[in-house]
Amino acid sequence: MSNVFVIDTYILIDHLRGFEPAKFLIKKIRDEKITAYISSVTEAELFSGKDIKLENNRRNLKELISLFEKIILNNEIAQKSGEFRRNYNIETPDAIIAATAFHKHCKLLTKNKKDFQKIKEIEVEEPY
């Protein structure tokens, strides 16, 4: 496994839910054995969860997000995500996350491999 990834939202959700393989992966990121980015879309998706209303959950989420370099949607990512959405018929958030991996020249780490693997321009890997 390469050591530089864009991390998909579902992996972070797994971590927040206490799923051990996801917690182990986040520990590797925290220990700087893996370099990981998230898209600003991932942050938005995480903060849209119903459990985020609780202050403790919001604090845990902010701490988790602080482990990553957040990649903000820019013109290049926006245009590439539009191309991915058009060419591969995927949802806009997924297209933006895929375009972020393309922009950073790294693999996309996701549990949702079936939706992303059709995008020929990026490498997709399942974490567990």
Tell me the role of every PLM-derived stretch.
Residues 11-12, 42, 77, 96-97, ...:
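Alpha-helix capping/helix-boundary segments
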Residues 1-38, 48-62:
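Short, well-structured N-terminal submotif of metal-dependent ribonuclease cores
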Residues 8-9, 46, 81, 101, ...:
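Generic structural signal for small/hydrophobic residues in well-ordered secondary structure
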Residues 16-17, 50, 85, 120, ...:
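Short, flexible helix/strand-to-coil boundary loops that buttress conserved ligand/catalytic motifs
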Residues 12-13, 44-47, 117, 125:
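Nucleotide phosphate-binding site architecture
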Residues 70-111:
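Active-site neighborhoods of divalent-metal-dependent phosphate/nucleic-acid chemistry enzymes
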Residues 7-8, 14, 38-39, 90-91, ...:
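Histidine- and aromatic-rich ligand-binding microenvironments
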Residues 1-2, 98, 103-128:
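Acidic, PIN/NYN-like endoribonuclease modules and their adjacent C-terminal/linker elements
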